[in-house]
Amino acid sequence: KDSSAWENIPVPNAEIAEGFDRIPMWVADMNFQTAPSVCEAITKRLEHQVFGYFNPSEDYYNSIINWQKVRNGVEGLTKEAIGYENGVLGGVVAALQAFSAPGEAILVHSPTYTGFTSVLNNNGRRAVHTELKRDAEGIWRMDYEDMEAKIRKYHIHAAIMCSPHNPTG
């Protein structure tokens, strides 16, 4: 057992109002069992017994190419046009390098996942914060007027948006 979602929900002795339930909404913890094909692939990979960095396989690229073709009607996509990242922050860095230059202002919600602000600082970008507003029901909402004003004022060309439903990641 190693899943908080499965082991700790429901929380013992917690009072829940009638008609409500608890739904865990973490970023990476799964709320469902893993598909047998995934377990089989992991078991097969374990037989190799050497774990380190790897290059994506042809199956990796082909699955993306096929997905884009079937789902979005994209024709002519090649593996050379597909990037590969091991994590979210690496992908954010790649996007920042592609769409902004050092010294430029990047719009970011506040509060936000601290990894995003660290990536901006470590890559020479300036974070311009736009505050999320908490409404009367306690729900975080984007302040579109503030966002537009800051985009104009700071000549912003790129933004990092974290889910307003989970603003700190």
Residue ranges and their predicted role:
Residues 1-87, 94:
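N-terminal small-domain helix-loop-helix segment of the aminotransferase-like
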